[in-house]
């Protein structure tokens, strides 16, 4: 799909350099789109080559420990003070921010939705975002929000940055380009893209689809990082070399543009006369990236039992409590099931964490019916969940030969905070009223006598 989209896309003359990438996670990168535009040996020369301005973008306090200290130096056509102006407030009524506890009539329970309907009008990426849940408090930089999006139009002269958190974008249908201040990222389903807090970007479509649809985790807290592997060792899971950060690219155009900002849950816009994506060169470790979920190397039980789903963690955003995430991004990818004498699907569970799930393609092994690509489910803290009746029967009675679980890619945003449902999610027409019935066939088998029932 992406190859076709690349052939169809024609770069405008004012857009320098197409998408290219540097491998690694958390590296101190350096890249320039014009030769000699990146200063050597210092960060802030008295005068920069090409008449550029030097500017630092900090993603952490100056005094953060070296391992978590993040900043990038940008060399740009105009400083960022020229990329904003007199702001006026605007509204994106479907994008909500924690704390958000609206009144709605939907009772507590396990919930599942079919995909968002395709837009009936022209919507850009920003206009197509719909908040499903919020958790924590963006003002104190803890928690997250789970969004779904569906759009069908490009952000041509519109640009955006989010001061409230970083955005982890998970496409389900349709490839698109995220053009950030630091470069271009082409992303397609089965890939993810992360845009750091405060970084300007716009989204344009690639390919030919009726709708571009997917999911977003807005992380208010500490940034996503790779989980510790512990006794797994130095390899497997998400390997650092498979993360791709874009090379420098800039957009040099003089035309009326709009910069939109999300700040403490409110939205603001300013009119400017040029593109703000004007970084010609940069170096540092505060940068966007993408990752191909197909490169995740899963580990699992190779004799018996089903391990905890934490073994499928791609990225984790830590909290102040050791071993407890502000939010985890977990996937359930293709893998071999080989455990003996074992109920192989995920087991029945009640959990202190709250789980928002989506399906990128294929089927999810614990629920083969009703949970479709583009769909969503929510199992809040301490609400029981697990395989549906048909999944239980199939796994309980099937032959335990090695089976490859293929054509599947589900994911989960899991947070330590309860996820508060938005009114939009509670009243969404695709809410499956009969979801709770998927467990109704699980009847009592116990009769007080020993033996397998």
From Swiss-Prot:
Q: Which domain of life is it from?
A: Bacteria
Q: Which cofactor does it need?
A: Fe cation
Q: What class of enzyme is it?
A: oxidoreductase
Gene Ontology CC: one annotated term: cytoplasm
GO annotations under biological process? L-phenylalanine catabolic process; tyrosine catabolic process
Q: Which GO terms describe its molecular function?
A: homogentisate 1,2-dioxygenase activity; iron ion binding
Q: Which InterPro entries match?
A: HgmA_C (IPR046451), HgmA_N (IPR046452), Homogentis_dOase (IPR005708), Homogentis_dOase_bac (IPR022950), RmlC-like_jellyroll (IPR014710), RmlC_Cupin_sf (IPR011051)
Pathway listed for it?
A: Amino-acid degradation; L-phenylalanine degradation; acetoacetate and fumarate from L-phenylalanine: step 4/6
Residue ranges of region Disordered?
1-43
Reactions catalysed, as given in the entry: homogentisate + O2 = 4-maleylacetoacetate + H(+)
Bias class Basic and acidic residues marks the residues at: 1-12
Q: Where does Fe cation bind?
A: 349, 355, 385
Active site: residue positions: 306
Under which EC number(s) is this enzyme classified?
Answer: 1.13.11.5
Query: What are the UniProt keywords, alphabetically?
Result: Dioxygenase, Iron, Metal-binding, Oxidoreductase, Phenylalanine catabolism, Tyrosine catabolism
Annotated binding of homogentisate, by residue: 364, 385
User: Can you state the subunit structure given in the record?
Assistant: Hexamer; dimer of trimers.
Q: Which family does it belong to?
A: Belongs to the homogentisate dioxygenase family.
HAMAP family xref list:
Homogentis_dioxygen
What is the purpose of this protein? Involved in the catabolism of homogentisate (2,5-dihydroxyphenylacetate or 2,5-OH-PhAc), a central intermediate in the degradation of phenylalanine and tyrosine. Catalyzes the oxidative ring cleavage of the aromatic ring of homogentisate to yield maleylacetoacetate.
Q: What is this protein called?
A: Homogentisate 1,2-dioxygenase
* Lineage, broadest ranks: Bacteria, Pseudomonadati, Pseudomonadota, Alphaproteobacteria, Hyphomicrobiales
């Amino acid at each position: 799909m992406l190859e076709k989209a690349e052939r169809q896309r024609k770069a405008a003359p004012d857009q320098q350099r197409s998408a290219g990438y540097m491998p690694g996670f958390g590296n101190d990168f350096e890249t320039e789109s014009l030769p000699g535009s990146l200063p050597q040996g210092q960060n802030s020369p008295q005068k920069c080559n090409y008449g550029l301005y030097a500017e630092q973008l900090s993603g952490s306090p100056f005094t953060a420990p070296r391992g978590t200290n993040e900043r990038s130096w940008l060399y740009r056509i105009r400083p960022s003070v020229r990329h904003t102006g007199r702001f006026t407030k605007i509204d994106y009524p479907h994008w909500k921010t924690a704390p958000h506890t609206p009144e709605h009539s939907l009772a507590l329970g396990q919930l599942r939705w079919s995909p968002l309907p395709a837009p009936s009008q022209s919507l850009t990426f920003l206009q197509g975002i719909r908040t499903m849940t919020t958790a924590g408090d963006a003002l104190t930089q803890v928690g997250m929000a789970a969004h779904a999006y569906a759009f069908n139009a490009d952000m041509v002269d519109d640009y955006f940055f989010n001061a409230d958190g970083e955005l982890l974008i998970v496409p389900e249908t349709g490839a698109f380009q995220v053009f950030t201040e630091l470069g271009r990222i082409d992303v397609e389903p089965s890939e993810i893209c992360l845009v750091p807090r405060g970084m300007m970007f716009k989204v344009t479509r690639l390919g030919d689809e009726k709708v571009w649809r997917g999911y977003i985790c807005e992380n208010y807290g500490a940034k996503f990082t790779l989980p510790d592997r512990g006794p797994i060792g130095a390899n497997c899971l998400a390997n650092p070399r498979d993360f791709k950060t874009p090379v420098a690219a800039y957009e040099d155009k003089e035309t009326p543009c709009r910069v939109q900002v999300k700040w403490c849950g409110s939205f603001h816009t300013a009119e400017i006369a040029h593109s703000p994506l004007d970084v010609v060169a940069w170096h540092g470790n505060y940068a966007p990236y993408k990752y191909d979920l197909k490169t995740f190397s899963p580990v699992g039980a190779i004799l018996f039992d089903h391990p905890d789903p934490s073994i499928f963690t791609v990225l984790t955003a830590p909290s102040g409590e050791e071993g407890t995430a502000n939010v985890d991004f977990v996937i359930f990818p293709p893998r071999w099931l080989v455990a003996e004498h074992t109920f192989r699907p995920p087991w029945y569970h009640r959990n202190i964490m709250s789980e928002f799930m989506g399906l990128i393609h294929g089927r999810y092994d614990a629920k083969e019916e009703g949970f479709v690509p583009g769909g969503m489910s929510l199992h809040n803290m301490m609400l029981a969940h697990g395989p549906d009746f048909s999944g239980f029967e199939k796994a309980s009675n099937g032959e335990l030969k090695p089976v490859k679980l293929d054509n599947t890619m589900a994911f989960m945003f899991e947070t330590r905070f309860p996820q508060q449902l938005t009114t939009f999610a509670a009243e969404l027409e695709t809410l499956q009223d009969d979801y709770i019935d998927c467990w109704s066939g699980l009847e009592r088998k116990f009769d007080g006598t020993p033996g397998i029932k």
